[in-house]
Structures are given as C-alpha cells and as structure tokens.
Amino acid sequence: MSLNSIKFEPADIASLYKNSLVEVNTKQQVLPETKTNAEPIATGWKYLGENKKKTLVVVRNADAVHIPDKQLSFLTKLLAACNLNLADVAIFNFQDHNSSEFNEILNFFKPKVVLLFDVEPGEFGLPMIFPQFQVQGYKDVMFVSSPSLDVIEPDKSLKGKLWVCLKKIFNL
C-alpha cells in the first residue's frame, strides 16, 4: 500500500489538524468540554419523524411542540431535494433543553447528520464553535449550523449556502 492510496475520513483529518490549514484573520473559539453524569439518563425525548436514516433536525420554537406548519412545509421540500422524507429524520425542538443534555441526545438519536436551525453549536453542547453553513465533523457525526428556517426560506443566498452543505453531506 502506497502513501498515495490512503483514504482519510473528514473527521480524522480534522483531528490531525487542530489548527487551521489556512491562516485567517479570525480565530476559532474552542469551548471547554462540559462534564456530564456518567450514568445514561433514560428519557422519552419528544420528536417528530421516525429517524430511519439517522438524521437529526434540531430547531428552536417556543410556539410549537415540534415545528410550525410553515417551517415544516419548507423543511419537507428541503428533505425531498435530498431524497429524504419525514420518516428518515427526527425533528427535535431544542427550546426547553440545554447543552448539558448533548451526550444524552446523541446517545438517544444516534445521528449520522445533525442540522442545527437557530441553535448555535456551543449552545447545543458541541465543544467547538464553527461558522454557519460549514460542515463540521465531530464524534463520527456531520454537523451544520444555520439560521432558522423562517430566515432561510425567503433568502435565496441563504438557501444556496444551505444547499451547498446538504449536497456535500448527502452526496447529491
């Protein structure tokens, strides 16, 4: 096996290069890892969908149990463009939760992809901060952070940025 034929996963490359490969003017802020209880907490998380393809959609909405109808309609169109439907994902409202539940959420849903809408990575419990519309790997999960679905829907440039991320994640 030659060195030229070695294939690395994106998460492996990210762990090899903790600092940027390219110098930029802004520094990425790293959050300290939060300590949680070692015991898993058995909880009945409320979510919409069947999570068949291990894709977790995290939203924040105080006015709905899961997601308002208008946002659900837009999200359904986004999922259809990615060859997914509501049965393939779990829609989780993060409104009444906090970062201390990060490990429990990951252990319960066991996602391969997490789409954060109106929830910052650090707020969700990730030990790093990354810009919106950047695909970021952590613990064998691909994360993308973006504004709320209400903000994205009318804005073509934001939709385009999200679409670039979705194409990368779902190999479209």
Regions found by a protein language model. Name each.
Residues 2-172:
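A polyanion-binding, active-site-adjacent surface
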